[in-house]
A protein has these predicted regions:
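Non-catalytic terminal/accessory segments
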Residues: 1-494
């Protein structure tokens, strides 16, 4: 099969998958109590497996092998994709498929700590991806708007924008519970999680598959096999969806509180007149903030209630890191600093969002590390090819905020770090010589057509709170667009 034919087969498979997902999502949305009893055949459907394979192969982790040593490339070069998927489908249907343990890999995180990743085999990743294609549209119908992490069409900027919206005038939710869950992905209770999954999934074969992946075990870096009696391994394709299913218990609880997001404007106003608090939750995966229009005592009381809610899922709040903060003091959330300040030159106060100091330190450390890794024996062009994308990507994330001052400061620090690198490279050269060689007589390093990226020249924007208008990937418009691309229907004439 040539490339054009294989692309058309994949596009038609994606069209079929999208059509079925749209139906599943609509049925789940229209009937909140519906349990889906025949989903396994979709997991083993050739179209779902092909789309799942394509997503696994296109992921940057495709070159990383699990405990069986196989990669996506080795499968293509060996038995071939067609035979691989046929064999996998047969194993699923005759129930001989068994997930293998994930391979443990420890990666560094901030503060010198390590994060455990679980690397599944390519075969297991394909099955997990197919499971996600089937389950995600169903559970997305239940997830509330306050949840943003690992969800389609949603991003961290949406969560930050909502938090800014809620703490700004005229809403002014001023007290904030900054939530921190201890080892969230490692401690989720399997029975509690399966209970929540089972509210929507009645197919015992699908439930068995999900449970098998949870119980697959971990092959440690010391080659010791450990059981997994709790948690969802970070790094697995299913883990983000399952963690959202577990943490939706928190979303549902806050939504149902008197004064919560389901309360009407009139009800919230009446509660405030009687000195009662109102609440809103903003969550991105296991990072969450509960904002309260009330008093600190109201925030403290609700923190204890939330600890009880999370305990039903086997989770614990960190007493040291779960803080109660006033918006005047500010808080860090998803890399951003969110704080109320007086606007310069006026007596008015506004809530601003800008890069947190921790985020700034992180990118400056990245710049220093790259300058150490790219030795002075290499060219300035080699350094800029590594350095520019890192700084540009950081600035792109923080562009929608009040980040101009931070960008200007970062630009100066990047410039001085690169200049120190050039001075080490040419220890006997004068400033004048270096400027003539690398800056065309100016001060900003450039080699050929590549110049050092200047954060100070990045314009800032405002990312607006989208509220409940965030589009669904399973809308009729998205389905029609895919069908046109696959040649299954004619494009409308305008």
């Amino acid at each position: 099969m040539n490339t054009d034919e294989s692309d058309l087969v994949l596009l038609r498979a994606e069209t079929r998958v999208l059509g079925i997902q749209t139906k599943l999502h609509r049925w789940a949305r229209d009937d909140p109590d519906r349990r889906f009893d025949d989903l396994f055949n979709l997991v083993a459907d050739p179209a779902f497996l092909l789309v799942a394979w394509d997503r696994v192969r296109g992921n940057r982790g495709a070159k990383t092998a699990g405990v069986d040593g196989a990669t996506a490339a080795s499968i293509v070069a060996g038995v071939g994709v067609g035979v691989f998927l046929d064999d996998l489908r047969s194993a699923l249907r005759d129930r001989s498929f068994r997930p293998l343990p994930v391979r443990e890999r420890m990666i560094p995180k901030s503060g010198g700590k390590l994060r455990r990743l679980g690397i599944a085999t390519v075969t297991d990743r394909v099955v997990q991806a197919s499971l996600k294609l089937v389950l995600e549209p169903i559970f997305e119908a239940d997830f509330l708007p306050c949840s943003y992490g690992f969800r389609p069409k949603r991003r961290a900027h949406d969560a930050v924008a909502e938090l800014w919206y809620l703490t700004s005038k005229p809403r002014e939710y001023e007290w904030i519970v900054e939530g921190d869950i201890k080892a969230c992905f490692d401690e989720i209770s399997h029975p509690a999680l399966m209970c929540r999954v089972g509210r929507r999934v009645g197919d015992s074969r699908v439930l068995g598959l999900v449970k098998a992946f949870l119980k697959a075990g971990i092959l440690g870096e010391d080659k010791a096999l450990r059981e997994t009696n709790a948690g969802t391994p970070q790094g697995s394709i299913l883990s983000p969806l399952l963690s959202n299913v577990a943490l939706s218990a928190l979303d549902d609880y806050v939504a149902g509180l008197p004064g919560g997001p389901r309360s009407t404007t009139v009800e919230r106003a009446r509660r405030r007149r009687h000195g009662q608090p109102n609440y809103r939750l903003v969550r991105y995966a296991d990072d969450w903030c509960l904002v309260i229009k009330g008093t600190r005592e109201h925030a403290e009381a609700l923190r204890e209630e939330i600890a009880g809610v999370l305990s039903t899922m086997g989770l614990r709040l960190s007493e040291e890191k779960t803080l109660i903060t006033h918006i005047e003091e500010g808080l860090d959330f998803l890399g951003w600093r969110i704080q109320r300040h007086r606007k310069r030159g006026t007596s008015r106060h506004y809530v601003y969002t800008y890069p947190a100091k921790k985020s700034l330190r992180s990118v400056m450390l990245k710049v220093k590390t790259l300058c150490r890794q790219i030795g002075v024996q290499q060219s300035l062009g080699d350094l800029l090819r590594r350095l520019n994308p890192a700084v540009r990507g950081w600035c792109a994330y923080f562009r929608p905020g009040s980040s101009s001052a931070t960008f200007a400061y970062l630009g100066h620090r990047v410039w001085s770090t690169v200049w120190r690198w050039l001075r080490r490279k040419h220890r006997r050269s004068t400033w004048k010589d270096l400027r003539r060689q690398y800056c065309s007589g100016g001060w900003w390093p450039v080699i050929g057509e590549t110049a050092l990226f200047d954060p100070a020249k990045v314009g800032t924007t405002r990312y607006r709170y989208r509220g409940s208008i965030i589009p669904s990937p399973w809308s009729a418009t998205a389905q029609e667009t895919t069908r046109v691309a696959a040649g299954l229907m004619e494009s409308p004439v305008h």
